[in-house]
């Protein structure tokens, strides 16, 4: 892990959780935030602080996207084009889980893979709080986090899956003036190790009905493979592969 990361146990924080994270990732526990990035465990949950910024995962801010008839208009929901019962999806590049949340809101049982331990800790805490929310709890109950390398996880996959979603875009590609607080902090973490081609190959071998890949609008297709169909937005597009 990034050697500039520390753990801080604040007032009301869960000591056992903080100690487990610190031990697992070989980072020190401090009584105050470090000079660079700090994973803070306090009464509010888990947050990432540093460089004058603080970020905590929160699905409550996405309620407006999944209520009042807005969900069917989401590009990702339109891209999956699958209907039925007991549908299963894998978000192989979970990040903070926003896209997985949209799929879960649409009815999918979603498994989220995240290999960065800091991001996984933030996402785990966001899911914990969402499962206590009167509206979010139903959606969050369909989301399961798996911490680990996505390629390895997909190679070990035994159960059939309907959709595998890939978002290999990494925040550092964006100009610093255009990125929000979350990305400013997350881009300071170590980038993911898995190459785009390795992710795509593992997704294909897993045998889903569809693979959905999020791409910058003007970028080339992942690994040069032409999609079955494309959904375009103003800044991004979804390349959709029917298997």
Residue ranges and their predicted role:
Residues 196-242:
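Conserved Class I SAM-dependent methyltransferase catalytic core
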Residues 88, 109, 142, 209-210:
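Residues at the starts of beta-strands that form the adenosine-phosphate
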Residues 96-108:
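Conserved SAM-binding loop of SAM-dependent methyltransferases across substrates and taxa
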Residues 1-89, 105, 113-163:
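S-adenosyl-L-methionine
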Residues 149-153, 191-204:
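A short, acidic, amphipathic alpha-helical segment used as a generic capping/interface helix at domain edges
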Residues 92:
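Conserved beta-strand/loop positions that form the S-adenosyl-L-methionine
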Residues 168-199:
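Mobile active-site "lid"/loop adjacent to the S-adenosyl-L-methionine
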